[in-house]
Structure formats: structure tokens, C-alpha cells
Amino acid sequence: MFGMGSKTIVGLDVGSSSIKAVELKKKGGQIEVAHLGLEALASDIVVDSMIVDSGTVSSAISKLFTDCLIKTKAVATAVSGHSVIVKKISLPSMSDQELAETIEKEAAQHIPFDLADVSLDYQILSEEAGSANMDVLLVAVKKDKILNYTNVLSMAGRTPSIVDIDALALQNCYEYNYQPAPGQVVALLNLGASVMNINIVKGTTPLFPRDVSVGGHQYTDSLQKELDLSFDDAESLKLGNKVGTVSEDAKAPILQQVTEIIVLEIQKTFDFFRASAAGEHIEKIYLAGGSAKVPGLMEALRQEFSMPVELLNPFQRVVPPTDGPGAELVEQNPGQLAVAVGLALRSFESL
């Protein structure tokens, strides 16, 4: 959204529990992974989508690039959370130049921040010939939020070329890998550690991007407290691994309680969407993110919403690495790399 592209861009997803880096290359008629890696972060380094400890994150980025042998300087990253506002607005049809001249005035009516404090971007969603109106997606991000991320990238010796938002990077990943039919409406869910990005998409048009302040850390916190576990053991248990003598009967109800909270937030979002998009029907849910594979979550979504639910695979068309740590990451949980892949695909915008 914000910034200028360059030839090759590394997709860098700075999350609450880890940093993911993906660099892609074009080979023949395909796009394949050149470099890919993940660096874990302690839970107090990135809090509520803000980088609290810049030095630690900067060092982690440098280490990740060194370990992955990434020499490219240009980086695309993404932000989410309370400092990000995304609104679909309807305006009288006008030329691109007229829109550029009036967008700030229109934004002032829809953005709950002082416009001096935000960076604005917009995208025309639909403009039918002869129609009196046009739909525009308005994106506003607080400048201090952008600086919070770009300063850390600069500290790590990288060039912040693009700052996107997570929900749109997720969509970019989906579009390239799944090549959706123009009328197909799906819900993309990215369940990170502290934030869930939701983007309801029709074909290649974002209809309803939204961030919700629930995430995988709630599973981990509940398991820690209820079963008196360390953070690492709770995290492992959350992802379906066996830990000590903890039984399935002890774990399942704790996971289910958090799943119910997450499902409720998704239900609210779907209700908001249906109220604002008359006649549109969500056909399928794609689930991504580090906590997408929590036991019971996919089944709960299928039961609650009575529609197909599947894990979003960022390597449906993007060719993954075949060996090394990158291949292991893809095998373990490809969905946690969806935002980073979507960002890295910005290198090939014309495809």
C-alpha cells in the first residue's frame, strides 16, 4: 500500500511470536522460493502489534537474513491492529485526478484519527461504466505505527520499500496461489499470536478487511494457567504435540473455550459483512497463521458456519524449498508463512 516497489523485495512478517522472511525468484514460468526462514521472538518483544524492544527485533532480523543467506536489502512489511483503519466508502464517480484531490476530505469523515497523524492510501474497488458511484477502499495507518516498523528495518540495515497491511498481504498470497473466479466470495482468516486478520474477498476484490484482537496466545495463556505449564510446553500442547502426562481430556476443554471466543469474533465479523453487503454469500473459509492448526479449530468453524474450511496453502502455486530448514518450516505449518509470501509476491505485481 505505502511506498514504492523495487525489483526484488523480501517479504518480512514481524509478528508477536516470530519474524518470517520470504524471498522469491522467477524461474521459467514459475515463482519459487529463493530463501525462507523464521526467527522466534519472546512474548514481550512485540505487544499489541507494536514493536516494544526495537533492538531485539532489529538483531533478530539481521540474524534471520544472515542465517537464510538473504542479501537483498529491499523489504516489504505489513502492519495490523488498532492503528490501522480500513473502510470501504462509496463516492460519486470521478477521474483518478479528482479522486486524488478529494480523498483527504472524504477520509476525514471516516477516519477517527487526526489526518496529520496518518498515512493514507486508497484503491478503487469497482467502477462500472455509466454508474453514478464508485467503491473505494480507504486505508489509514498511524504514522508512528509505520515508523515503529520502518525504523527497526533501517536499524537492521534494510530498506523499507513497502508497508502493506496484513489482511491485504494475505489476500495477495491467496490470489496468486488460488486464482479465484471473479464471483467467488471467500473469507480469509489469519490467526496470529495476538491478532486475527479477516478479509472477505470476492474474486480479487477485498470486500471487508478487519483486524480482531484475539489470537493464538490466548490458547497458550489458558493452557499455562489451567495446567500450570511453562510457556514452551503450553505452546507445544496448543499445536497438537504430546507434553508430559497432560491428557487429551485435560487439554480439549481449555482449547475449546478459546476456540469459542475466536468463533464468536468471526461470527460478529460475518454479521457486520452481511449487513453491509446485501446479497453476498460467503462460500468458503481459508485459514492461515501460526495457530491455524490448533486441534479442533477447523472442525469448530465447519460446524458453526456450515461451509467448507481448509488451511490456506501459500505454496499451492509458489514452488517451496525441497530441503533444509525452509522445507521443514513449510512442512510443519505452511499457513504461518502466508503474509510473508503475500508480501514477497509484491516483487511480481504484474503477474
Please state what every model-predicted region is:
Residues 1-40, 59, 74-78, 132, ...:
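Gly/Thr-rich phosphate-binding beta-strand-loop-beta motif of the actin/hexokinase/Hsp70
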Residues 1-106, 147-149, 157-159:
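Non-catalytic, solvent-exposed interaction/assembly segments
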Residues 43-46, 143-172, 178-180, 205-246:
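Glycine-rich phosphate-binding loop plus the immediately following alpha-helix
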Residues 61-74, 156, 229, 267-284:
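Phosphate/pyrophosphate-binding loops at sites that engage ATP/ADP/AMP, CoA/4′-phosphopantetheine
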Residues 78-178, 284, 314-321, 336-339:
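Active-site neighborhood for divalent-cation/phosphate handling
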Residues 225, 236-284, 291:
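Adenine-nucleotide phosphate-binding core of ATP-dependent small-molecule kinases
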Residues 258, 280-316:
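Glycine-rich phosphate-binding loops at beta-strand->alpha-helix junctions
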Residues 292, 310-351:
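Glycine-rich phosphate-binding/hydrolytic loop that grips phosphoryl groups
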